[in-house]
Amino acid sequence: MNDKRIDQMIYDGNKMLQRAMEELNRPEEDVVSLSVCKGTKMTLDLFISAFLLKNNVDPNTLDSVIERYEKCLVIDPTFDKIDIYQLDCMDEKGCDASRYCLSVEKVNDCLKIAEDIRTKVVMS
């Protein structure tokens, strides 16, 4: 049962990440950075949650993306190579979109982190 759930999370995360990438490929003046940011943050959560499920941890028992990420660090310390704390919007409760979704450059950073986490999860 969890395998299907994990596969669905990865599939949904990939679709959302692809949409964010497509948005960023538009001319910069046409990019809706808030849309990219929100989609990418949901992607981060999906991939992190999929990793936890792969490791028999129910992500719903953890209150935030940060708590889930920190649990990933306990399971696999190499997650520290992917530093989601560098995102200005992250705090102990998760993402505050109003603090971050202002420029294409910043949402591009978030997209890169989501890609790195996807790679880590798929390869694990």
Summary of predicted features, one role per range:
Residues 1-124:
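Terminal alpha-helical segments
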